[in-house]
């Protein structure tokens, strides 16, 4: 099984370089101002310039306006957008021309949340016909938080679940539990922020190595 790995909440160029060198497929850049991993324009430019070719920078946004997406997409040449708590009807035609791929976030804590994923995908397809189908990032629900909570999703709910689009598993993943998560859920990708950090936004080299090795090894043993 081929597993993609996204290292999210990167705030330093050296961490972007290290994650890419170790085999990360994508680097998440957080533009939610209330996040401890929030990037200013100056710092975001530095991080993006450190990401090598064929590794995707991903802009992470919470309830964004079309103007915000257009600004950051243009400023950083972003083509992949991760959207939390957003209204697809406000995205506008410029976003459709700019966006090559999108990731929609959905919290999952109970069985009824699986239907919310299907609804999210249907609404996206209806409202953004000019944009390709999204992936869905699944995270744990914690009141007032948009990711980075350290809480795990009930993996057993996602075992065998098919949303009709790629599934990205987030939520409390670490080097110690990612192998079990991959074997149970078999996601398209895994996403980690706090599980590979020494402090918010500061990636830990040893944790990165162990996480990526554990995730890749687990996926390699699956058909």
List each language-model region with its residue ranges.
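A C-terminal functional module that forms or caps the active site or interfaces directly
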Residues: 164-184, 197
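A short, Lys/Arg-enriched amphipathic alpha-helix followed by its capping loop at the start of a domain
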Residues: 18-24, 51
């Amino acid at each position: 099984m081929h597993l993609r790995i996204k290292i999210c909440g990167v705030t330093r160029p050296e961490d972007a370089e290290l994650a890419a060198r170790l085999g990360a497929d994508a680097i998440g850049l957080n533009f939610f101002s209330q996040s401890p991993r929030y990037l200013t324009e100056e710092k975001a430019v530095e991080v993006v310039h450190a990401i090598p070719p064929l590794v995707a920078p991903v802009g992470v946004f919470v309830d964004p306006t079309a103007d915000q997406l257009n600004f950051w997409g243009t400023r950083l040449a972003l083509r992949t957008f991760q959207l939390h708590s957003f209204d697809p009807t406000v995205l506008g035609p410029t976003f459709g021309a700019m966006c090559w791929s999108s990731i929609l976030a959905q919290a999952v804590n109970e069985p009824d949340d699986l239907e919310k994923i299907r609804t999210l995908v249907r609404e996206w397809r209806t409202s953004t016909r000019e944009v390709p189908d999204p992936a869905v990032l699944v995270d744990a629900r914690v009141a007032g938080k948009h990711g980075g909570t350290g809480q795990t999703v009930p993996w057993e709910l996602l075992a065998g679940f098919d949303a009709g689009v790629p599934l990205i598993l987030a939520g409390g993943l670490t080097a110690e539990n990612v192998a079990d998560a991959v074997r149970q859920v078999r996601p398209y990708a895994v996403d980690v922020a706090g599980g590979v950090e020494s402090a918010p936004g500061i990636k830990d080299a040893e944790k990165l190595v162990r996480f990526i090795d554990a995730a890749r090894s687990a996926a390699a043993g699956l058909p």
